[in-house]
Amino acid sequence: MHSFVSRFGIRRALGFGAVAVLAVASHAVAAAPAKPAEVQQIELFQRLPAEGAASLQALIERFNAQSKEYQVVLSEQDWKSANAPHLMILEGDDEERFLAGKPRFKPLYAVMKETGSALQTLRPPAMMTRTPVDSKGQLLALPIGLSTPVLFLNRDALRRAGMNPETTSVATWFDLQTVLGRLADAGHTCPYTVAEPGRVMVENLSAWHNEPVAAMRGKVSAPSFNGMFQVKHVAMMASWHRARYLQVFERGNEAGQHFASGECAVIAAPSNSWAGFRSKGTIDVGVAQLPYYDDFPGAPQNTLADGPAMWVAAGKKAAEYKGVAKFVSFWLQPENQVVWQRETGYLPLNRAGLLASRSELLGTDLENIKVAVGQLTNKPVTGDSAAQPVVGREKVRRIIDEELSGVWADRKAAKEALDNAVVRAAGS
């Protein structure tokens, strides 16, 4: 996107005599004014939640204010257009479609290397989604929106039910059950809800207890999330649903909206939800680690990090990739990492961001990140607690949620629902 603009002066061909006359007369030949450098635009496509979109816009404005050669502009064109944007923030189904078929991206590590730019990120850990990482652990894309499920609590609701938010334990699922019972007794109609049930109840609870969600069938990895542990947890959640401790909302971010409004007192949701919950200002929000079963050997283990990543389009000019690298480097500067974490709730991308999350100077602004990082690094990752390279992950999550809806409607037992989900996922 940067085009090299040569600066040139106009030189006149002068004979010896003319030079002598000019020398005597001391007439200087003036250079023509330099042509102003062209500004190269870097187009970026994104569909982040409100807090993320606003923070990204502010980041772009800061970059543009200090960059003379490159300007980042938001684009409505996505990767399906004939001239795809240089940068695309993708997740879920859109990311999976983008990655299907012929390669449409240039690996981020290659962009940074070819432009002589350092990629100042943490090495991708084993509990992070494998989508933006190659087999050598190199970043194919920048995972700008990582999160992991944690527990959020309406501290005001706990106080009204006679509990002290500072001392009330929700460390285990049985602790949480006691808390939800007291909330229900106090008249709360939605003590607990969960965003993305399949992601929380199956993927992350399995990793949190070092239980596999896939098994090798010959040389192929096949879904295997219908074991005794997963069945036990879903069965317990079904009993909570019947007791009206748990409400499940199946449309988009509806669960988060019910928590933010104060209707639901506790929610298991992605750690980045912290930014949105606090921005509403309607409730006093607390955050805690996801509960675990203390009667399960070795628990808790670690949870998983997932979320949108920023991909670089293939087929662009070398000068344009230089602009991309400059923007990525700017994003990874310590001060920008701190602002990004505070405003979006997403996990740190490098050591500077990680250190900021531990700083006492920021008060509770990054409390969600402290909790999330504590979960992710609780114990060294094992083969069973590592993120699995699942093909069609979003489709599998939808299958799990669809089967679980039969449990909430009291049409299916926990084992039947999970058995069905495994069969459907294997054939998807």
Enumerate the predicted regions with their spans:
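Short amphipathic alpha-helical coupling segments at ligand-binding clamshell hinges
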Residues: 55-59, 232-236, 318-331, 417
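Glycine-centered hinge/linker elements that transmit conformational signals in sensory
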Residues: 177-183, 219-250
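C-terminal capping/gating helix-and-loop segments adjacent to ligand/active sites or protein-protein/ligand interfaces
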Residues: 134, 367-425
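Short, solvent-exposed loop/beta-turn-alpha elements that line the ligand-binding surface or hinge
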Residues: 109-123, 168-169, 191-192, 211-232, ...
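Extracytoplasmic/periplasmic substrate-recognition and gating elements
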Residues: 65, 161, 246, 279-347, ...
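Extracytoplasmic/periplasmic solute-binding protein
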Residues: 135-144, 174-222
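Conserved N-terminal structural module of periplasmic/extracytoplasmic solute-binding proteins
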Residues: 2-4, 15-17, 23, 28-102, ...
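Hinge/lid segment of periplasmic solute-binding proteins
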Residues: 95-150, 204, 286-288
